[in-house]
Amino acid sequence: RKPCGKNEVWTECTGCELKCGQDEKTPCALMCRPPSCECTPGRGMRRTHDGKCVPVSECPRKMPK
């Protein structure tokens, strides 16, 4: 397995990882996905568009239209 990056943990039964822009209430099917590194659960982390795990406060801001 590949080493996990900053703010990631190896998880045998991964769930739905939240991405920047998604909130805690985003629906998720309760099923295991293949083992992989995921953003540290329960710590308010989100996956950015370029694959990094960052705190919600560091998610890129959407530009107004």
Curated annotation (Swiss-Prot):
Keywords: Disulfide bond, Protease inhibitor, Secreted, Serine protease inhibitor. GO terms for molecular function: serine-type endopeptidase inhibitor activity. SUPFAM superfamilies: Serine protease inhibitors. Changing K25N: In inhibitor 2 and inhibitor 4. Disulfide bonds join C4-C37, C13-C32, C16-C28, C20-C59, C39-C53. GO terms for cellular component: extracellular region. InterPro entries: Ser_inhib-like_sf, TIL_dom. It is found in: Secreted. The record marks L30, M31 as: Reactive bond. Residues 4-59 form the TIL domain. Defends the organism against the host's proteinases. Belongs to the serine protease inhibitor-like (TIL domain-containing) family. This is Chymotrypsin/elastase isoinhibitors 2 to 5. It comes from Ascaris suum.
